[in-house]
A protein has these predicted regions:
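PRPP-associated nucleotide enzymes
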Residues: 1-219
Length: 219
């Protein structure tokens, strides 16, 4: 159990301290991953950026992820085949559902990044952070997107997730760090005392603060 997202970030930090700050980049999955990643990037003194991925929900059950779609010129769709089979959705159905999520990805890119270019990832140790995962569809999509940028090492860092999801992610990156894998996992929010919604303004402020920190350091 975590007090809040910042405490989760502090506990993940203990596992990430050995990383070389000269070659590490922290990426957060908005919105819930930002307060977790904020603590880590601030303490390590490394760049913080985001990976824009949207969950694609099952029609009538939007909380159940059948896929995830990424940002970019050629958005990538990562399908949870087990969920798709149970829901009776083929890849054409999922592609149509994913297309509906693209406007929200574009909206978030505009308000979060305000035209700032992404932090270069080639040759870096890249850590992707979220506040927790259930099916892993969003994290899996993020890992595949970032892998195409040729990082030297790719790590997923999550406070809480089901053991089966963590096992499925291990083939997608070099290392998975997960602090808690409860046998009775039902929802991420149940493992936090304070799991309030993270606003767009909070995300934007965190990103802006880290961008200023790096700019000031380079002067």
């Amino acid at each position: 159990m975590f007090t809040d997202r910042r405490e989760a970030g502090q506990r993940l930090l203990d596992r990430l301290v050995p990383l070389n700050p000269e070659s590490t980049v922290i990426l957060a999955l908005p919105r819930g991953g930002l307060p977790v990643a904020d603590v880590i990037a601030e303490a390590l003194g490394v760049p913080l950026d985001i990976v824009l991925v949207r969950k694609v929900g099952v029609p009538g059950q939007p909380e159940v992820a059948v896929a995830a779609v990424t940002d970019g010129k050629n958005p990538k769709i990562t399908v949870n085949e087990d969920v798709a089979r149970i829901a009776g959705l083929d890849h054409a159905d999922i592609a149509k559902l994913a297309e509906r999520e693209l406007p929200e990805i574009h909206r978030r890119r505009e308000i979060y990044l305000k035209g700032r270019p992404p932090v270069p990832l080639a040759g870096k140790i890249v850590v992707i952070v979220d506040d927790g995962i259930a099916t892993g569809a969003t994290m899996r999509a993020a890992l595949r997107l970032v892998r195409d940028e040729k990082p030297a090492r790719l790590i997923a860092a999550i406070p809480v997730a089901p053991a089966t999801t963590i096992a499925a992610l291990e083939s997608e990156c070099d290392e998975v760090i997960c602090l808690e894998c409860p046998a009775d996992f039902r929802a991420v929010g149940l493992h936090y005392r304070d799991f309030g919604q993270v606003s767009d303004a909070t995300v934007s402020n965190i990103i802006e603060r880290h961008a200023r920190r790096l700019t000031d350091r380079s002067r």
